[in-house]
Amino acid sequence: MARVNEPFEGVIMYRRDYRERDLLVKILTDRRGPLMFFVRGAKRKGFKLASDILPFTYGSYVGILADEGLSYIVSAQETHHLTGIGADLNRNAYATYLLELVDQAFEEGRALGGWYKQVMAALNLINTGRDPQVVVNVLEVQLLNRFGIAPVWDRCVVCGRSDLPLDYSEKMGGMLCLHHFAEDPYRFHLTPKTVAYLRLFATLNLAKVDQVHVDEATKRQLGRTLDKIYDDQLGLRLKSKRFINEMDSWTNRLLTARKNPGTDDEKKPAGS
């Protein structure tokens, strides 16, 4: 059966060298999820699609979409660059992690349904300067279902009550209310704010929000909570996530150094 050209929407996830003049380009498509495209001659000077296949470019394309093996791009109809992501290291790091997480969560060649719009909404929020950690945390909560984990966020898993203080339990697979905290001595001891945001994030449609304000202390606890769930229950340790953690560590060191500018000098021996 001859393969035919099809129009599709997509965002460039990443690309890598293939042979001397060619590239393999991973695109998150609206119709078939993540697909790997072979782009012949993409590294040649003056290649007509050069700007259309840069990372964090999105738009309308035409190509051959393969159920198995490599797909092919024929043309780009209209494309745009997420320039805010490309110009900022922090935004770039979180957007890269988001797309790597999505790549792990969805099989190649399977339609995404509403997920494509949710991912694009997340990228657009990051691109326009919204807090990238908060945006990515929303998707981390929602993508757990795709990985086969379905925490109960909105009520106690034992009695179903939602009107009492709640805390998260990995052992029980969701929230415990105050009356059932004893069911898990290793519950997370989350603050009410963190619990409230986890419950909100589980159903939040990013296409319908402009901003979600989260204070720094709650952001830290949200980050630690989701890192622990992904580490303990999925064993998912992505390279892009490690980079974010390292970047946060560098930032904390710089902030500490600025708060204590004389610390290093005070440690030096007299006369040095």
Curated annotation (Swiss-Prot):
GO biological process, one term: double-strand break repair
Keyword DNA repair carried by entry: yes
SUPFAM superfamilies the record matches: ArfGap/RecO-like zinc finger, Nucleic acid-binding proteins
Alphabetized Pfam families for the sequence: RecO_C, RecO_N
Keyword vocabulary terms for this entry: DNA damage, DNA recombination, DNA repair
GO cellular component, one term: bacterial nucleoid
Keyword DNA repair assigned: yes
Protein role: Involved in DNA repair and RecF pathway recombination.
Entry's family note: Belongs to the RecO family.
Protein name: DNA repair protein RecO
Highest classification ranks of the organism: Bacteria, Bacillati, Bacillota, Bacilli, Lactobacillales
